Amino acid sequence: IIGCGKIAQVRHLPEYAANPNAQVVAYHDKNRARAEEMAAQYGGVVCDSYFDLLNRDDVDAVSICVENRSHAEISTAALYAGKHVLCEKPMAVTLAECESMVAAAERNGRHLMVGHNMRFDPVHRRAKQLLDSGVIGDVITFRAVLGNAGPEGWSVDEGTWFFDKNKAALGALSDMGIHKVDLIQYLLGQKVIETTAKVVTLNKRDSEGNLIGVDDNALCI
């Protein structure tokens, strides 16, 4: 596990622990105490750097649960180290980074997966079956809405990186909206070819009272 924040704590680690075919053996987080807490709870060792973790022979695959800006860097390093990768969404912050990750996976013969977990929801899988069978007919419009209380109600850190543009790079559209962008393409079996989007930052402030630098509302057509 690289990155031991909230998504690792509530999704990745509990689900690996419940899977008899998986064993978590190593952790890295910039906050070492956080990694040590997870190791104490689930077993395994703490590594001083993600390079140390990737160099371990007993690591077959890694979950990358770090800030958006570091997804491509760490994923690519893991693939070249011969590890399979499950990277949290968004895949990366530029198209070039995404392409470099795919190239690294192909070049090293390793699996690269992005955490678009809504594809595996039983309701969505059933909808996919109905759409593919033609029972529903042609889809003319598709409307999806997703919202939550915001990173301030989610992150383990009061000063969450989600509000730091240098780390998050993007905002609500990439952190939340990406689920629906992927789901639409999965359900319909078609790729998005044209988009129009509006992203805005309302009067939202970080834990120190400063206006946040990333969008917290988005509309995409």
Where are the predicted features?
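N-terminal Rossmann-like dinucleotide-binding module
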Residues: I1-Y42
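Acidic-histidine catalytic/liganding microenvironments
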Residues: N19, R56-D57, D121
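Short active-site oxyanion
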Residues: A22-A26, D60-V62, G171
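Rossmann-fold dehydrogenase core element
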Residues: S100-N117, G137-F142
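Predominantly a Rossmann-like dinucleotide-binding segment in NAD(P)-dependent oxidoreductases
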Residues: M118-N210
